[in-house]
């Protein structure tokens, strides 16, 4: 390969790199983000054990096993939803 091609490929890489790095955000757009749980669906803890694990982080910085457990505790503790996933700091 000539040095001209190497320079061209290097510049092309520098130009296209930001697009490849930020293209992941396309898939995590607002329509794909999990919304706050609909707590009217959950009435008691007994029905929570049948629901799969789907962690919810609340404003008390505790991680709840799934939406159901979060919603039941929300009534008692007046919690606010932060995001779906494990709370990353305590």
From Swiss-Prot:
InterPro entries, per the entry: Kazal_dom, Kazal_dom_sf
SUPFAM superfamilies in UniProt: Kazal-type serine protease inhibitors (SSF100895)
Residues the record marks as carrying a glycan: 38
Signal peptide: 1-23
Domain called Kazal-like: residue spans: 33-89
Keywords per UniProt: Glycoprotein, Secreted, Signal
Source domain of life: Eukaryota
Purpose of the protein: Does not function as an inhibitor of trypsin, chymotrypsin, subtilisin or elastase. Binds sperm and enhances sperm motility. May act as a decapacitation factor, suppresses BSA-stimulated sperm capacitation and blocks sperm-oocyte interactions in vitro.
Record's protein name: Serine protease inhibitor kazal-like protein, minor form
Organism: Mus musculus
Name of the gene encoding the protein in the UniProt record: Spinkl
